[in-house]
Amino acid sequence: MKALLVLGFLLLSASVQAKVFKHCELARILRSSALAGYRGVSLENWMCMAQHESNFDTEAINYNSTDQSTDYGIFQINSRYWCNDGKTPRAVNACGIPCSALLQDDITQAIQCAKRVVRDPQGIRAWVAWQRHCQNRDLSGYIRNCGV
């Protein structure tokens, strides 16, 4: 019985480990997911935004006390508008997903939700980190030597 508890704990802890992508690994995934060039947003811009939002960490979570919302995952997608965390007042959930889906090692749902975000009029400007760190900058270094 004790061995089963230990095994269960080990399996549970393994399933909640954060994935921190290496930059070329993430660049290849974003390219193969048709995010590169989506709505005119280059792969370099996506990479810059993801680095400055989460440092490529799938389990990044940041609480915003001003509006009681939380940003989730590699793209730091906000619970006020895009996902449901069950605690953000007046949440819209425009992506139609639980915020926990944005914390998965498999970032397929995060990519789909990011595509939904950029379809709005703000586009990539919805991400403050992109505005502060990426907009109107030379971003070529984000994919240099990645073969993408």
Curated annotation (Swiss-Prot):
Upper classification of the organism: Eukaryota, Metazoa, Chordata, Craniata, Vertebrata
Stated role: Lysozymes have primarily a bacteriolytic function; those in tissues and body fluids are associated with the monocyte-macrophage system and enhance the activity of immunoagents. In the intestine they may also have a digestive function.
A cellular-component GO term for this protein: extracellular region
Pfam families: Lys
Disulfide-linked positions: C24-C146, C48-C134, C83-C99, C95-C113
Subunit structure: Monomer.
Signal peptide boundaries: 1-18
Keywords: Antimicrobial, Bacteriolytic enzyme, Disulfide bond, Glycosidase, Hydrolase, Secreted, Signal
Domain of life from the UniProt record: Eukaryota
InterPro entries with a match to the protein in the record: Glyco_hydro_22, Glyco_hydro_22_CS, Glyco_hydro_22_lys, Lysozyme-like_dom_sf
EC number: 3.2.1.17
Catalytic reaction(s) noted: Hydrolysis of (1->4)-beta-linkages between N-acetylmuramic acid and N-acetyl-D-glucosamine residues in a peptidoglycan and between N-acetyl-D-glucosamine residues in chitodextrins
Family: Belongs to the glycosyl hydrolase 22 family.
Catalytic residue positions: E53, D71
Organism encoding this protein: Rattus norvegicus (Rat)
Name of the protein: Putative lysozyme C-2
PROSITE patterns: GLYCOSYL_HYDROL_F22_1, GLYCOSYL_HYDROL_F22_2
Compartment(s) where it occurs, according to its Swiss-Prot or TrEMBL record: Secreted
A GO MF label: lysozyme activity
UniProt cross-references to SUPFAM superfamilies, sorted A to Z: Lysozyme-like
A GO biological-process term: killing of cells of another organism
Extra remark: Lysozyme C is capable of both hydrolysis and transglycosylation; it also shows a slight esterase activity. It acts rapidly on both peptide-substituted and unsubstituted peptidoglycan, and slowly on chitin oligosaccharides.
C-type lysozyme domain span: 19-148
